[in-house]
Amino acid sequence: MDRKIREQIIAIYSNLQHKQDLTQFAHCLTTKADDNCEDFFNLGLQFQNNQLTALGFNGEGCIISTIASELTLSALEGKTIKEAIVLLEQFMEAVQTGSLSTPLPQALQLLWDFQIDQKRLNCLLLTPQNLLQWLKDFSH
């Protein structure tokens, strides 16, 4: 991993802006991992006029899944539900194909730059994958 990226990750992990108590959030979901992973996060979402106005998380996970939660929520704050779905789909497609076809917001770009090996991919995708599915279900 590039030294600059490592320094950014450490700085973000040392000052998680979205890790908080979730009692004030109207909508909450819990991420689900596979049987080989004990990481879990509760995600809190606030909407106003179809826009994500506040996001938060709490729970336990490795540094990769924690940073992925923080950066995913950072990238989606202020977006409409439709915009959030499109961004998450673009990110998931890039990770699955190994190719970035469209520019990503800075926070998701940093996740892309992680260069995670296959063994840790579940950690990276825990929050983006679960949040994408929840937003799709919520919007229908």
Swiss-Prot record:
One of its GO terms (biological process) is iron-sulfur cluster assembly. GO terms for molecular function: iron ion binding; iron-sulfur cluster binding. Signal peptide: none annotated. It comes from the Bacteria. This is Uncharacterized protein MG337 homolog. It comes from Mycoplasma pneumoniae (strain ATCC 29342 / M129 / Subtype 1). The lineage of its organism: Bacteria, Bacillati, Mycoplasmatota, Mycoplasmoidales, Mycoplasmoidaceae.
